[in-house]
Regions:
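N-terminal, Lys/Arg-enriched amphipathic/low-complexity engagement segments
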Residues: 2-46, 51
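Short, structured beta-strand/loop micro-motifs enriched in basic residues and often containing a Trp
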Residues: 5-14, 53-59, 142-150
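Short, Lys/Arg- and Gly-enriched loop/turn segments at beta-strand edges
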Residues: 36-46, 81-90, 173-183
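Intrinsically disordered, low-complexity linker/loop segments enriched in Gly/Pro
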Residues: 80-161, 166
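Conserved mixed alpha/beta catalytic, RNA-binding, or beta-rich assembly cores of soluble enzyme
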Residues: 130, 143-148, 157, 163-235
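Conserved small/polar residues in nucleotide/adenosyl-binding loops
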Residues: 243-244
Length: 244
């Protein structure tokens, strides 16, 4: 079992980054991650505006898988996700789906007995998922806050323990990074956050040689998802419609 700590993190996925860990195909890796605010918000007096964009969405990595080549696919099995003792949620009037209708605030959400204690009256069963996970793109540096065909900030709530993600390999070694774990998240981020939390993620990585994919695929056990990220909705629809 290999491990990589959260101090080995990046804010972009890039073909030019040096790997922080080398593993073999079939190896298991324990990946420790910061929350999406780089663990800088610890109480409700600290607001998102004090964090700075240079600390948002850190991903631990890159992890190079020896033998992975462009045109291969990287199979990433999510074996387990263990989260910290408290999650952080923030709102800001300039961000999200409700601009101008919310104030800038922070909510610290304790995690107790497998539930997120949002308030005295509201508890939500946790379902930890990985928000940012991807390989290095072939020719450009892409911020970890953006999703593309290599993965990235897909914020797909089905990327949970027990699921398997298939990612395109575009550089030698694949250079996998992951982070932005949520204790729980809905179908999207209305306020540009879920229950953001530090975590320890265990994965198994396997190279599927000569089996290219045009975009990420996820096998949840119950369904298979093609994940497309485009600026325009219809472009995303076309991308997943022509993957055969």
């Amino acid at each position: 079992m290999h491990s990589i700590d959260s101090n080995a993190c990046v804010l972009a996925l890039s073909p030019d980054q040096e790997p922080r860990l080398h593993v073999e195909s079939g190896d298991e890796v324990t990946v420790r991650t910061l929350d999406c605010f780089s663990n800088t918000i610890t109480d409700e007096s600290q607001l998102f505006s004090t964090v700075g964009w240079d600390k948002v969405n850190p991903a631990t990595g890159p992890i190079a898988v020896n033998g992975a080549r462009p045109g291969d696919t990287l199979k990433v099995e999510i074996l387990s996700i263990e989260v910290g003792e408290q999650a952080t949620m923030t709102t800001h009037p300039d961000f999200g789906a409700l601009p101008g209708t919310v104030e800038e605030r922070t909510r610290i959400v304790p995690i107790r007995d497998g539930k997120a204690q949002f308030s005295d009256d509201i508890t939500i069963p946790i379902r930890p998922m990985i928000g940012v996970i991807g390989t290095a793109p072939a020719s450009e540096s892409v911020p970890t806050g953006e999703p593309r065909q290599h993965g990235g900030n897909m914020d797909t709530k089905e990327i949970v323990a027990g699921s398997t993600l298939y990612l395109p390999v575009e550089v030698d070694g694949a250079n996998l990074s992951l982070g932005d774990v949520h204790a729980v998240m809905g179908d999207g981020e209305v306020a540009v956050c879920g229950a953001e939390i530090e975590a320890e993620v265990k994965i198994r990585v396997t190279v599927l040689e000569g089996r290219p994919l045009p975009l990420p695929f996820l096998d949840s056990g119950d369904a298979v998802y093609a994940i497309s990220s485009e600026i325009e909705l219809m472009d995303a629809v076309k991308a997943v419609s022509y993957t055969h």
